[in-house]
Amino acid sequence: KKDNNAMYIIVAAAVAFILRLILGAVYRGHNTDMSCFIGWSNAVFENGFGKFYTLDMFHDYPPGYMYVLYIVGAIEKLFGFSDGAQYALVKLPAIVCDILVGVLIYKVAKKKFSDGLSTMFASLYLFNPATIVNCSLWGQVDSVYTLFILLMIYFISEKKIIYSYFMFAICIFIKPQAFIFTPILIFGIIENVFIKDFSKEKLLKNLGFGVSAIILMVLLALPFGISNVIDQYTTTMASYPYLTVNAFNLWGALGKNWEGLSSFTTVIGYVFLIAIVAYSVYVFFKSKNNAKYYFVGALLAFMTYMLSTKMHD
């Protein structure tokens, strides 16, 4: 079917990209995080994957994004970028993913709305000050794993669940925070593999591809050293042992910023997580609309941030 509105979304995406790139070059961003990304890109390129996690430097990211930063480091070394050009280059992967998220919103919206409304919805994201500040000015990379989470949800909602296994694997390989979206994948498996047209062949096929996604993660981890990667995940998951770190959530509202976790508050945090998952189960299976995957995803992200402990800005 011909898309009569294609030119509008292309122009919107191009303008949003250029705007982000310019702002990304003008503003360095969050000094600590940008120093990490720049330092990591140089370190992983100069020392290689195998030595990266053994270097005497701070690193709290899994290997997934290190592959991206390796390319960034190679380009930076080749062209000798510095200052604004360097800032823009480091932010470029997140900027590209930000734009792709907007395009994906357009694609999903077109299934229910007109071309014009779909373009408007995509533009609301592409020109949302919060996403621009987060990505281009602040220099954060949330849009990278957000893109893969949305692709996972998209493939599940389109009954192409096999692709979702690989999207989720890549996402976990980029940021372990993606684990909070595990219930969505489980819901998709229950609904698309077990409830609808269940068969032994279908189960084995999905099991095979699920294992393949895990094998993909293992293969990508090998250059870094399996033990190094496992240590990195366990260290990252155990970091920020506080009720909240500069996060505007329930604990921040109670004045608990940077307050260490006690045995009691740790239990409370787990209770909240169980309650969040239980509520997402209720909402998912009560809804008959296929958009429930997106809604439950938003619900999990919002409620986890607002109620869980160890959240940070």
What are the functions of these language-model segments?
Residues 104-107, 144-161:
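Specific aromatic-rich, kink-prone transmembrane helix
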Residues 88-112, 272-285:
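Transmembrane-helix motifs of polytopic, lipid-linked glycan transferases
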Residues 1-22, 110, 118-120, 208, ...:
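Start-transfer (signal-anchor) and selected internal transmembrane alpha helices
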Residues 4, 102, 236-310:
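Aromatic/glycine/proline-enriched transmembrane-helix motif characteristic
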Residues 11-15, 197-224:
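Hydrophobic alpha-helical membrane-interfacial segments at the cytosolic entry of transmembrane helices
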Residues 16, 121-127, 168, 172:
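Short helix- or helix-capping micro-motifs
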